[in-house]
Amino acid sequence: MTEIFGKLHRSSNSENTNQASPSTIQSHSTQPVLSNDHSTKVNDYEGKEGASSNGYDPVFMSDRMKMRYNEITAQLHKEQSLKEDKESGSNSSESNGITPMGTYSEKPKLLQSRTPPSSCYIRHDTVVPKDKNGQHAFGRLYVRLHQGRDLNVKSVNAQPYAVITFEKTQVMVPPPFKDIDGGIPISIPSKNRPLAGSASGSSSGLHSELMLADVRCPHWDFETVFDVTKMKSQMVVSVYDKYEDDKFLGSVKITPIFLHEYVQEAWYKLEPLDLTKSLEGEIKVETIYEHIEHVRYGPEDFTALRLIGKGTFGQVYLVRKNDTNRIYAMKKISKKLIVRKKEVTHTLGERNILVRTSLDESPFIVGLKFSFQTASDLYLITDYMSGGELFWHLQHEGRFPEQRAKFYIAELVLALEHLHKHDIIYRDLKPENILLDADGHIALCDFGLSKANLSANATTNTFCGTTEYLAPEVLLEDKGYTKQVDFWSLGVLVFEMCCGWSPFYAPDVQQMYRNIAFGKVRFPKGVLSSEGRSFVRGLLNRNPNHRLGAVADTTELKEHPFFADINWDLLSKKKVQPPFKPNVQNDLDVSNFDKEFTNTNVKNINIVSNVDPANASTPLSNTIQDRFRGFTFVNKSIDEQFQNLGLQENEETDNLHACRTTTHSSVNSINSHGNPRTVDANDPVADTVFGETFEA
């Protein structure tokens, strides 16, 4: 990565930049050469004149440490002043605006807070490449997280780390390496030596302050690169303290400037999630955008690292993109299988919906980065959500506290709101299709059973979904069903999250159908508040016309007393701190996924093509291959994407009325955690058309 920074620096010429009044942004059209050196520490000056090479005597440390502290501070200010004068003279008389090799654009100093001067500048002769539609072509965003200062940490053992999020792709920045032998030597007083009022106690306290000052100003010097697939994207850098159980230290939202080889360098003030409160601390971030021509990717451009999931028609891999080393999830789908099962339309529909939701972004829906195909397979490349499936966490914890479940349900409501607003019915809401990112926010995935172009009161008839979450009208109504089926599934999900089992589960599928259509459910004792129970009853009303959400869709759900403490505006901007943060060590962490998959050896797996001899010997005909025309996702407008696809979105001709159902594999394992099915005898009854859902 450092080579890229240097390459961009050498490839462009700059003009002198006039520095404005102190602010928070420093941008250039050329790349200053960055050093991997950490900024000057206090101990760097211990060997200078006036410093003892033998450490110090703790008995006489108090006055000496104070004197040394003042000397160091004065020296830092002096060197910084000389450096600025030198750079100013160099830039004005000898330089063409390019920072000489081996120097710094700025070398931050410990114990000194200085906001760099601001300048926003780009050469007038810079050519900004555009595509044939007049839009800026896509490229790569290089990011360097330099350092922080004045972070709100209270312990010298603090381990500040960061999560950088861009277009839903997340990168973990580990805590900075601590040199155990570095810094001013620590003197540990003897147990029998008095501390109160002694010079030793005073020096120890001052030394602790210096150590804390060092910890509050971490130096990450971390570099990474992101694929840019849409303009106007923002980058979020969130800072946490691992030592204090992932305490949130603040975040910044940065809007990069997508001009070729444009450098943006700034100090950004950390902001709390609740803007009515204040936070200390700043971080220094640098970004460079690099334009690339339109590129068509294929499976050979990715390397499989782990298997993280497996389905009826293919597998999901953790992959690394070879040119940027960025980590993604790759869904590989066998063309032969979906043709044989008559699922071509559903599969292409999934891709279309991912394109639509990616271009009109929802923060709670997984983002599509690329899609492409070979003669035998289809490939969907999406953001990797390292927090794992919600199902995995529910399986391991049995059930969630109501507040945690409410947070997930609220974000799901916003995800469904986005889909319904765009006339999309989801139809497969279940824990396996809900992912968590590294911060603990949800992302809805797997749109294989979703249907687009379904207006508010329109109906559809396809019998599909996961058995335990099917709405009764899917089983009983010949006239079809509406988007209300998503709210029924949401009610089942709330019950399962809070109670620990599915309300309609039975070992026999036919019995499960009867339970959904006519069975009664009782809440367990001591679970769910009265508002929570009211919310579930409203969603599990068997009459879709009386169900919560039937009149005003998700607006009704958001106005329910169950969500009285939810600030929907802050939640939609991810400004509400999740109640649970997954344990994620790095970008390659798969510990939140099922080991049945992640322990699979992928070294011999060929993601480029099917290794099945049958597939190799009997290729698909040109007529069948033509059905997949337009699957590849490139940098085009959404209208062009759908025009290139040779079928209408609202067609469901492959498997109309054919049952595609799966039993929910989590039920037995969740019940095995020992959640007793004790019910509340005082729970009131809910009125429905098809029969009472809840038993008295």
From Swiss-Prot:
Q: Where is this region: Disordered?
A: 1-59, 77-118
Name the EC number(s).
Answer: 2.7.11.1
Domain C2 residue range list: 122-272
Which residue stretches does the UniProt record annotate as biased composition, category Basic and acidic residues? 38-49, 77-88
Q: From the Swiss-Prot or TrEMBL record, give the protein name.
A: Serine/threonine-protein kinase sck1
| Gene Ontology molecular function, alphabetical | ATP binding; lipid binding; protein serine kinase activity; protein serine/threonine kinase activity
Do you know which SUPFAM superfamilies this protein is assigned to?
A: C2 domain (Calcium/lipid-binding domain, CaLB), Protein kinase-like (PK-like)
Protein source organism: Schizosaccharomyces pombe (strain 972 / ATCC 24843)
Q: Which Pfam families match?
A: C2, Pkinase, Pkinase_C
Looking up InterPro entries in the UniProt record yields:
AGC-kinase_C, C2_dom, C2_domain_sf, Kinase-like_dom_sf, Pkinase_C, Prot_kinase_dom, Protein_kinase_ATP_BS, Ser/Thr_kinase_AS
Ranges of residues in domain AGC-kinase C-terminal: 564-643
- What residues bind ATP, as annotated? 308-316, 331
Q: What family does the entry list?
A: Belongs to the protein kinase superfamily. AGC Ser/Thr protein kinase family. cAMP subfamily.
Cross-referenced CDD domains, in alphabetical order?
STKc_Sck1_like
PANTHER family under this entry? RIBOSOMAL PROTEIN S6 KINASE
Q: Which SMART domains match?
A: C2 (SM00239), S_TK_X (SM00133), S_TKc (SM00220)
**What keywords would UniProt list here?**
ATP-binding, cAMP, Kinase, Nucleotide-binding, Phosphoprotein, Serine/threonine-protein kinase, Transferase
- Active site location: 428
